[in-house]
Amino acid sequence: MRKLRIPLVIVGAYFLMQSSCEQNNQNIPYVPVNFDINLNLPSYTSLNFPGEHLIVQGGSKGIIIYRYTMDEFVVLDRHATFDVTLGCHVAVESDGITLSDESECSDSKWIILDGSVMQGPATLPLHRYRTSWNPPIIHVYN
């Protein structure tokens, strides 16, 4: 009985790894991100206030930086996650909280606070980048 368990565990682990690889096919392309933003510079002063956002170049389709609180930032890639092969990007709607892709892509919506899906057909959140905050510098990286 013991000899039978080892092959079953190996086969089970193999299928588990295969299924997790299939899920990664919907991930956005990996692009190295590593930059600093000085909020004292005129180009970035809008980020001095919670609830404001800024779109900068970088990532796969651009990057959205959102100031959540005085000490917290949310940084998301603009690459829509419904079907990454379409290459669609998200934009910030007029309410400043909702992100949406073009209707010809999927008409999905995400929330800027964490990148989670508000309305499908997309099921995956937007890719979130890491940040560190040492006033007035925000460091964004993956």
PLM regions with names:
Residues 22-96, 111-112, 125-142:
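N-terminal pre-ligand scaffold of iron-sulfur
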Residues 109-117:
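Short metal-binding segments enriched for Cys and/or His
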Residues 120-122:
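Short Gly/Pro-enriched turn/cap motifs at secondary-structure boundaries
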Residues 54, 97-106:
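Cysteine-rich micro-motifs
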Residues 1-21:
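Sec-dependent bacterial lipoprotein signal peptides
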